């Protein structure tokens, strides 16, 4: 099997081929070589596949759209912008927060919601993703929300679906988790006392295997954050991560000193092929987000985590449940961001069809 991907070959490659690539390089191969058909010619969203390729104005437009789903008291509101449309949730990987918040977002927008039971689907019987996709298209859904263990699966589906269907990436392998990245940006936008351009952000944990880290770093850079710090054992850092324009720290205390935002990441045990840590207790000792380390950050700093958390390994319970934690706010903000992305994707599809494409 070839170790290279080019945009000409995408329609004939199964997404399972992408899992052959090492997480050290998967982001480069996907972002440099894959066709990214996520924008219409007018710049509106046709599919939402990743943060890369979107500019600052487009990210700010998503944040601004999400803000419209909060009332004056900060409570989420319903708005039937997708009434009469059908959204199909295709989660080929287990999920609690992402799947549930997408479903809540879809229902708040008035959409008809179809949840496909993947455990009973034909993909479990050996059917290819392409054949599964073509059969699901016959159900006349307007939007597919896709989570898959193969990096590039959402891109693959975007090249295969009919023009009247939008694909939203709910997380693909090691590659990207764009709605998580955007809900993190919305959270920072709502909680930080300073604009993005003046923030120092520390990202701590399993960066090598984290699709969240890739999306967050890309979004932070696009929104103008100049001081992005990462800290993890060398075994959990992608090779050459410095090329992303981040500062790499080996010492956790130095990394979080004077930071505005500390973002913890889960250790991706299900994606790690062999042991990369001495022990959980050693990890917590050197890299855990503790009250003592939070005290090194700025007085108004806050902590974030995409979940699920490993308490006592990645983060102390007193921090996760403390006054500086915005972790539960992230969940609520996730509903607003997913409402925004769903609404903008449907607007983009209507614009695409109106243009006669």
Swiss-Prot record:
GO MF assignments: amino acid binding; aspartate carbamoyltransferase activity
Function recorded in the entry: Catalyzes the condensation of carbamoyl phosphate and aspartate to form carbamoyl aspartate and inorganic phosphate, the committed step in the de novo pyrimidine nucleotide biosynthesis pathway.
Region (Disordered): 1-21
Native species: Psychrobacter arcticus (strain DSM 17307 / VKM B-2377 / 273-4)
Catalytic activity: carbamoyl phosphate + L-aspartate = N-carbamoyl-L-aspartate + phosphate + H(+)
E.C. number: 2.1.3.2
Protein name: Aspartate carbamoyltransferase catalytic subunit
GO cellular component terms listed in the entry, alphabetical order: cytosol
Family indicated by similarity: Belongs to the aspartate/ornithine carbamoyltransferase superfamily. ATCase family.
Pfam family, one: OTCace_N
Pathway participation: Pyrimidine metabolism; UMP biosynthesis via de novo pathway; (S)-dihydroorotate from bicarbonate: step 2/3
Gene Ontology biological process terms in this record: 'de novo' pyrimidine nucleobase biosynthetic process; 'de novo' UMP biosynthetic process; amino acid metabolic process
Assembly behavior: Heterododecamer (2C3:3R2) of six catalytic PyrB chains organized as two trimers (C3), and six regulatory PyrI chains organized as three dimers (R2).
Enzyme class: transferase
UniProt keywords, alphabetically: Pyrimidine biosynthesis, Transferase
Gene3D superfamilies for the chain: Aspartate/ornithine carbamoyltransferase (3.40.50.1370)
Binding-site residues for L-aspartate, renumbered to this chain: 125, 211, 266
Feature: compositional bias, Polar residues: 1-17
Binding site for carbamoyl phosphate: 97-98, 147, 177, 180, 307-308
